[in-house]
């Protein structure tokens, strides 16, 4: 028989119910703090910082990231809440608080059921079937984004109700297109402004995270940078040493876009970057085969560089005969783990226009749908421009907080464009819960599977319930009143305390946000409820400092060494 707790070699292990209840306590405490931010009348949370004034926020994922408990088992639960919030934020840009509320509800109810003898595996099967029905219902409720007004509404909600930021994002999408590149940078005034500049995007990010210059945003930013574009691998540091020496002498950064960079050269570049001797970043070339070479030619023309290593060009990386003319320039390069944005390339505008016209001609004459699509992608990247939102504010803290909100709003707005919008305010999940009534009556379900369905049915009603509670009203009463109305677009406007058509009132969520929130929450809760053991590190025991050592007073003279 397993014991309920055991200690082995600096670790503590808890088993079964005790392990799950310890984690559940941490989950509940963490979600209690996160849930207070949900909805238009959600409350602020004040977070102590390691330096400076406390941070005041209404962003669920920021609250989740700040929570850490002294008890390691409770902390494990809190970290799993943080994990689900982070994942939802990364995939959808919004819905983090909804995810937290859902994971706490599913986990808590499942533990109560397991304690009364419910089989967790069968219960999970029931949950999975319920989630499938929920996702189908959300898809059926979804509407396509048809206007800039819809985009502004989604962006405003995701930016915590900031209408100015929502309007700017709507304008940016209108100018560069729904698939266009929108980026942010620090402004030089108190106001936030929009500017469209010449730019190009590449669907590849940095080769190594060691190139990152902004640890918080996990991106590398190079200002007024040289650009080296190579169709071949950079296999040895010696082949690019003259280029590195050249950029070091000028004091400017270097962006290398190459077929690949092998470990020896990469290690040397990273070492020098970390030592502060070199400002550099490396990106793998986008595309495959002939399309890769063509895209590298596009990049070279945009930056005013010469494509080295191209077959038949006779232009190679040569340590003996380096010509600075092979390097192009960009005013700014922003590189994340997934993509790269180049602004204001040094290429001649006449050559860029000529390249654009060439691509248009190729598109017109192309018969293959696949090839035409690739050509259209290249054309969009070369000619679409980049919308830059210059974020203003009274302090660096204010600017950074605004940039975080814009990043989230951009992510959720793109999600809305791709997968459509659904009624907001928790209504989409609330309506989806009614679709589970027929599943509960399915005779093929076992009793334990039916329990799993019921747990999901209760959980998906909780986000709307929490929004109402945060607005100071009775959650259960409002939820039932919404469900009694047969019009699936009707919900509760917590800001104005009235029942409205959610689409007409502009209270909408991207369908992807709702989909990701329920999927991630149930996935993490299912893993926790089926856990049979939890292992944490024991706190290290402090070794008491040695007191005065009798008879050793003569060693006091060693103090002269300091």
Swiss-Prot record:
Family note: Belongs to the chaperonin (HSP60) family.
Induction and repression of expression: By heat shock. There are multiple isoforms that, with increasing temperature, shift in relative abundance from the more basic to the more acidic.
Top-level taxonomic group: Eukaryota
Further remarks about this protein from its record: Exists in at least five isoforms that are not related by a simple post-translational modification and may represent the products of different genes.
Any Gene Ontology biological process: protein refolding
Subcellular compartments: Mitochondrion matrix
InterPro entries: Chaperonin_Cpn60_CS, Cpn60/GroEL, Cpn60/GroEL/TCP-1, GroEL-like_apical_dom_sf, GROEL-like_equatorial_sf, TCP-1-like_intermed_sf
One GO molecular-function entry: ATP-dependent protein folding chaperone
GO terms under cellular component: mitochondrial matrix
Gene3D superfamilies: GroEL (3.50.7.10), GroEL-like equatorial domain (1.10.560.10), TCP-1-like chaperonin intermediate domain (3.30.260.10)
Effect ascribed to mutating residue 142 to N: In strain: PBOL
Protein name (record): Chaperonin HSP60, mitochondrial
Protein role: Implicated in mitochondrial protein import and macromolecular assembly. May facilitate the correct folding of imported proteins. May also prevent misfolding and promote the refolding and proper assembly of unfolded polypeptides generated under stress conditions in the mitochondrial matrix.
Keyword tags: ATP-binding, Chaperone, Mitochondrion, Nucleotide-binding, Stress response, Transit peptide
Residue range covered by the transit peptide: 1-8
TM helices/strands, residue ranges: none
CDD domains: GroEL (cd03344)
């Amino acid at each position: 028989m397993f014991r309920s707790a055991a200690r082995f070699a600096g670790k503590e292990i808890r088993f079964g119910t005790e392990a799950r209840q310890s984690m559940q306590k941490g989950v509940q405490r963490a979600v209690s703090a996160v849930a207070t931010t949900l909805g238009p009348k959600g409350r602020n949370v004040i977070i102590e910082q390691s330096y400076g004034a406390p941070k005041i926020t209404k962003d669920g994922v920021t609250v989740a990231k700040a929570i850490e408990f002294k008890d390691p088992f409770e902390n494990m639960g809190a970290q799993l809440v943080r994990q689900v919030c982070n994942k939802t934020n990364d995939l959808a840009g919004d819905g983090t608080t909804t995810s937290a509320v859902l994971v706490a509800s599913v986990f808590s109810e499942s533990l109560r059921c397991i304690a009364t003898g419910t089989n967790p595996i069968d219960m999970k099967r029931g949950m999975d079937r319920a989630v499938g029905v929920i996702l189908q219902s959300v898809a059926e409720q979804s509407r396509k984004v048809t206007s800039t007004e819809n985009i502004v509404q989604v962006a405003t909600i995701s930016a915590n109700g900031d209408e100015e930021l929502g309007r700017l994002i709507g304008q940016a999408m209108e100018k560069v297109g729904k698939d266009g590149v929108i980026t942010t940078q620090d402004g030089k005034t108190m106001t936030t402004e929009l500017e469209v500049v010449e730019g190009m995007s590449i669907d590849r990010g940095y080769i190594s995270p060691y190139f990152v210059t902004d640890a918080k945003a996990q991106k590398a930013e190079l200002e007024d940078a040289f650009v080296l574009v190579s169709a071949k691998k950079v296999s040895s540091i010696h082949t690019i040493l003259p280029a590195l020496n050249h950029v070091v002498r000028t004091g400017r950064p270097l962006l290398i876009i190459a077929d690949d960079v092998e470990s020896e050269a990469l290690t040397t570049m990273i070492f020098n970057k970390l030592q502060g001797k070199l400002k550099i970043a490396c990106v793998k070339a986008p595309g495959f085969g002939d399309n890769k070479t063509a895209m590298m030619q596009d990049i070279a023309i945009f930056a005013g560089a010469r494509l080295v290593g191209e077959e038949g060009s006779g232009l190679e990386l040569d340590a003996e005969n380096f010509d600075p003319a092979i390097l192009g320039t960009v005013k700014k390069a922003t590189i994340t783990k997934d993509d790269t944005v180049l602004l204001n390339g040094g290429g001649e505008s006449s050559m860029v226009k000529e390249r654009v016209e060439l691509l248009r001609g190729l598109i017109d004459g192309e018969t293959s749908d696949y090839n035409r699509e690739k050509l259209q992608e290249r054309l969009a990247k070369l000619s679409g421009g980049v919308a830059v939102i210059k974020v203003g504010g009274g302090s660096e803290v204010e600017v950074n907080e605004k940039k975080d909100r814009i990043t989230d709003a951009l992510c959720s707005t793109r999600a809305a464009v791709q997968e459509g919008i659904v009624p907001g305010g928790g209504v989409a999940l609330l309506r989806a819960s009614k679709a589970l009534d027929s599943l509960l009556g399915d005779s093929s379900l076992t009793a334990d599977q039916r329990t799993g369905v019921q747990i999901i049915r209760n959980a998906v009603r909780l986000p709307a319930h929490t929004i109402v509670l945060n607005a100071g009203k009775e959650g259960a009463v409002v939820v039932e009143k919404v469900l009694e109305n047969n019009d699936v677009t009707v919900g509760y406007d917590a800001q104005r305390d009235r029942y409205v058509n959610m689409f007409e009132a502009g209270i909408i969520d991207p369908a992807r946000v709702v989909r990701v929130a329920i999927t991630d929450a149930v996935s993490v809760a299912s893993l926790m409820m089926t856990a049979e053991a939890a292992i944490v590190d024991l706190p290290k025991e402090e070794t008491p400092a040695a007191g005065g050592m009798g008879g050793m007073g003569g060693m006091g003279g060693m103090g002269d060494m300091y």
